[in-house]
Each structure stands twice: as structure tokens, then as C-alpha cells.
From Swiss-Prot:
UniProt KW keywords: Membrane, Mitochondrion, Mitochondrion inner membrane, Translocase, Transmembrane, Transmembrane helix
Compartments, as annotated in UniProt: Mitochondrion inner membrane
Effect of residue 170 to M: In strain: Zimbabwe 53
The protein's name in its UniProt record: Cytochrome c oxidase subunit 3
GO molecular function terms noted in the UniProt entry: cytochrome-c oxidase activity
Subunit structure: Component of the cytochrome c oxidase (complex IV, CIV), a multisubunit enzyme composed of a catalytic core of 3 subunits and several supernumerary subunits. The complex exists as a monomer or a dimer and forms supercomplexes (SCs) in the inner mitochondrial membrane with ubiquinol-cytochrome c oxidoreductase (cytochrome b-c1 complex, complex III, CIII).
Positions of transmembrane segments: 39-59, 83-103, 120-140, 163-183, 198-218, 240-260
UniProt record, GO biological process: mitochondrial electron transport, cytochrome c to oxygen
Recorded catalytic activity of this chain's protein: 4 Fe(II)-[cytochrome c] + O2 + 8 H(+)(in) = 4 Fe(III)-[cytochrome c] + 2 H2O + 4 H(+)(out)
Length: 262
């Protein structure tokens, strides 16, 4: 940020990452379309590699600006907070579309579905087995990330480390159970609107859990390198907000799709 002078505002240097990120996104989507049409997966893999490398180096630069260069002033931090809040709001609206599709189909099932929900021939999951365990796991992870945050505010380095470690562990455990549930599922994404809405909603939530787990893992590594203090730790706060958002979305998914809709 050489353009930064004696003022608090957020002016950034020229960066290649928006361009490489756009190239990575375009390559990933193009590769996905090819893959879905029975072509090879190489373009999709290349796009993912470009995107992951871009995200890593972009966030590395942001961490350097805030940790080593001292460029994240109060005004900049306020802007970052609003950016994260608006990002989470956009994610909320993203999931609203999935719930809308689900309720549109389930509250008045079409005659082609047997005028019933779940549709005729669909064997739904028992909400009191793996889904209930996953709910308990995510609720527990919400407790551990809050524990880590309060410990950080009290300058308790070891308890912050423990809280973040257990949160990441619970996130990985949730993902493993979700993958097992998908493998054992008695229906597929092609089995009527029920399969489509189920796998779209829970699948995108699963992707968000993976992103949140990665976010918290980065926070754990940064904490071990003393990047956070009790007064300056917005990276951790953003990860905690995102994780609580993931928790709340899962509660709605569990209550509506697994319990009521099953």
C-alpha cells in the first residue's frame, strides 16, 4: 500500500489478485460445465488451483497490511466490518432462494409427485440420527468459537488456541458425517424436486462449513504466530461471525428440510 500516506483511509496498492481471481473463477465454471458433460476434469482442477492460489496470496497480503504494516486503522477496520456484514447478508439471501424453492414445492406438492411430501418413492433421512448429531456438533462448535473469542479478549493465549482447535476439529467432524450421509443417501439429486432442493441446500451449506473451517484454521495459525491482540483481531471476529451464520443456517435446514420436510 505505497499509496497510503498520513491519513486513515483504505487506499490499496495495485494488485494482480482480482484479475487472477476472475480468471480462476471463469476457468473453474467452464471446467465444471465440461465435466458435467462427460469431458475430462482437468480444466476444473486447473481453475480450482488458480482460485486457491489467488485466495491464499490475496489474504496473505491483507494479513501483512494489517499485522506488519499497521495499515488497518480504525476507519479501515470499520469499512472491513461493514464489508463482512454485507457479505453475510448476501449469503443469507442466497440461502433464502433455496428455502423458497423448498417451501414452494413442499407446501403444495404437484400431482406428479403424488400430491405428497416427501414425494412418492422417496425415503427421507431420520432427523434423529446423523442430522441430530450434526446439529449438536455445530452448536458445540458455536460454543467453542465463543470461548476462543472471550479468551482472546482476556489475553488468554492457551485457551484461545484450545477453543479454535476444537472448533476446527468439530467442523471437520461435521464434514465427515455429512459426506457419509451423502454416500449412504437412499435418493440422489436427480430424484425429483425433493432430491434437488435437499442436495442444493445441504450441499451449499456443506461448502460454507468447509470455507468456515478453513477460515478458522487460518485464524488458529495466525494466533499461534501472535498476529492477534485483544484490541486488534478483526480477522478472528470475521471468522466467528461467519461460523455463527453457518450454525444458524444449519438450524433452519435441520428444522425445515430434515424434520418438518422429512
Amino acid at each position: 500500500m505505497s499509496t497510503h500516506s498520513n491519513h486513515p483511509f483504505h487506499l490499496v496498492d495495485y494488485s494482480p489478485w482480482p484479475l487472477t481471481g476472475a480468471i480462476g473463477a471463469m476457468t473453474t465454471v467452464s471446467g465444471m460445465v465440461k465435466w458435467f458433460h462427460q469431458y475430462d476434469i482437468s480444466l476444473f482442477v486447473l481453475g480450482n488451483i488458480i482460485t486457491i492460489l489467488t485466495v491464499y496470496q490475496w489474504w496473505r497480503d491483507v494479513s501483512r497490511e494489517g499485522t506488519y504494516q499497521g495499515l488497518h486503522t480504525y476507519a479501515v477496520t470499520i469499512g472491513l466490518r461493514w464489508g463482512m456484514i454485507l457479505f453475510i447478508l448476501s449469503e443469507v439471501l442466497f440461502f433464502v432462494s433455496f428455502f423458497w424453492a423448498f417451501f414452494h414445492s413442499s407446501l403444495s406438492p404437484a400431482i406428479e409427485l403424488g400430491a405428497s411430501w416427501p414425494p412418492m418413492g422417496i425415503i427421507s433421512f431420520n432427523p434423529f440420527q446423523i442430522p441430530l448429531l450434526n446439529t449438536a456438533i455445530l452448536l458445540a462448535s458455536g460454543v467453542t468459537v465463543t470461548w476462543a473469542h472471550h479468551s482472546l479478549m482476556e489475553n488468554n493465549h492457551s485457551q484461545t488456541t484450545q477453543g479454535l482447535f476444537f472448533t476446527v476439529l468439530l467442523g471437520i467432524y461435521f464434514t465427515i458425517l455429512q459426506a457419509y450421509e451423502y454416500i449412504e443417501a437412499p435418493f440422489t439429486i436427480a430424484d425429483s424436486i425433493y432430491g434437488s432442493t435437499f442436495f442444493m441446500a445441504t450441499g451449499f451449506h456443506g461448502i460454507h462449513v468447509l470455507i468456515g473451517t478453513t477460515f478458522l484454521l487460518v485464524c488458529l495459525l495466525r494466533h499461534l504466530n501472535n498476529h492477534f491482540s485483544k484490541n486488534h483481531h478483526f480477522g478472528f471476529e470475521a471468522a466467528a461471525w461467519y461460523w455463527h451464520f453457518v450454525d444458524v443456517v444449519w438450524l433452519f435446514l435441520y428444522i425445515t428440510i430434515y424434520w418438518w420436510g422429512g
